[in-house]
Amino acid sequence: MDSVSNLKIAVLINTPPDETDFQSVVRECFREAFASIAPTGEVDFYDPVVERKFPDASRYDLVVLSGGKIDAACSDPWVLGVLDYVRITARDLPKTKILAVCWGHQAVSRAFGGQVRPVPAGEITAIEDIRLTDAGMKFFPFAATSGSYRAIELHSGEVYTPPPGFISLAENQECFINDTNNVLTFQAHPEISHELASKLILEEDKKHSRNSSAEVLGIDRPTEGLKLLERVLQWLSE
């Protein structure tokens, strides 16, 4: 990998356009997060949905699969294109690492033989303490003492069966790394700041008229997304 100052990152925005500003919010979250931890790095965005554009992975240190508002189990042509791209990149360009979040986590699992499904209890919008496995505590030393990392979850689908050749770094199929060490996935959103996470949780609570306390909502303690992404940057050279 190049040094952090020369870091090159490609982000695939994996969501169809709609009447909201969701796509621009996704871009801004990644732009701000990487600017915080790699301010001189280069971040490029690609649209695999409408433009069907994919990065030349050989030009990048890291390819990121974003979240998205579509079923990761569907067979839309662009979804199948993302799955093929991930498989080919991981196989043919192992020096380029792949990071996948939320929908991307599910898509990667499907691409390599795992199973995804709708969340049985319905859509999840919550800040959660995600419990680590023994392997996860070794991979995320900053979280070894607590045994968990804290991040926001925003999803209606989940990984039901993990893909062969992937190691669980967190319980409940929340985080995987493959055994060739070039694909890392999170169900949670490390790119979303604590401020935005808190805003989203409060809006969801207000929508359902719960008006819960900050403690009940889980927004009283900061999320650890930047710590997770800092660990991702360290991983690029491992």
Curated annotation (Swiss-Prot):
The keyword Hydrolase applies. Residues 8-238 form the Glutamine amidotransferase type-1 domain. InterPro entries: ChyE-like, Class_I_gatase-like, GATASE. PANTHER family: GLUTAMINE AMIDOTRANSFERASE YLR126C-RELATED. The keyword GTP-binding does not apply. Disruption phenotype: Affects the production of 2-(2-(2-carboxyacetamido)propanamido)benzoic acid and downstream compounds and accumulates 2-(2-aminopropanamido)benzoic acid. Belongs to the peptidase C26 family. Its EC number is 3.-.-.-. Keywords: Glutamine amidotransferase, Hydrolase. Coiled coil: none annotated. This is Glutamine amidotransferase-like protein chyE. It comes from Penicillium rubens (strain ATCC 28089 / DSM 1075 / NRRL 1951 / Wisconsin 54-1255). Glutamine amidotransferase-like protein; part of the gene cluster that mediates the biosynthesis of the yellow pigment chrysogine. the NRPS chyA mediates the condensation of anthranilic acid and alanine into the intermediate 2-(2-aminopropanamido)benzoic acid. The remainder of the pathway is highly branched yielding at least 13 chrysogine-related compounds. Pathway: Pigment biosynthesis. One of its GO terms (molecular function) is hydrolase activity. GO terms for cellular component: cytosol; nucleus. The active site is at C102 (nucleophile), H189, E191.
